[in-house]
Regions:
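Conserved hydrophobic positions within beta-strands
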Residues: 38-40
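Short aromatic-glycine-enriched beta-strand elements
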Residues: 46-55
Length: 124
């Protein structure tokens, strides 16, 4: 009985640490923003987060991690809202590593062609 309890406690602590690391934003400057304009190369609507690749005119490819499906659906974003080929402007917190091409703390996405706009209302 005691071993089972200790095993359960250890497992819950490991899970808590993993969840905390998953949502750690220490690699980003949360108090700053950058604007990146480009074309969506691919987009994947699946949990835990919707992801897409964004190619700039300079040929740089950024891997973007958006919110989860439920959060996006509450914001009226569905699997057909954005698609490969859409030109967008992404406003996000920049990574502390200037060579990083990963953007996670998305604050805003605009599609200039039709004026569509998404703004973050909750923390990812």
């Amino acid at each position: 009985m005691r071993r089972t309890l200790l095993a359960a406690l250890a497992a819950s602590l490991l899970f808590a640490a993993a969840a905390s690391a998953h949502h750690s934003y220490g690699a980003y400057f949360e108090d700053q923003t950058v604007s990146i304009e480009g074309t969506i190369e691919s987009i994947h609507f699946a949990n835990p987060h919707v992801t897409f690749n964004l190619r700039t005119d300079a040929g740089e490819v950024y891997a973007a991690e958006w919110q989860n499906l439920i959060q996006l659906r509450h914001g009226n974003v569905g699997s057909t809202t954005l698609k490969a080929g859409d030109r967008v402007v992404v406003v996000a917190s920049p990574p502390r590593d200037p060579s990083s091409r990963k953007i996670t703390l998305l604050r805003e996405i605009r599609r200039p062609a039709d004026g569509w706009l998404w703004r973050r209302t909750t923390r990812q």
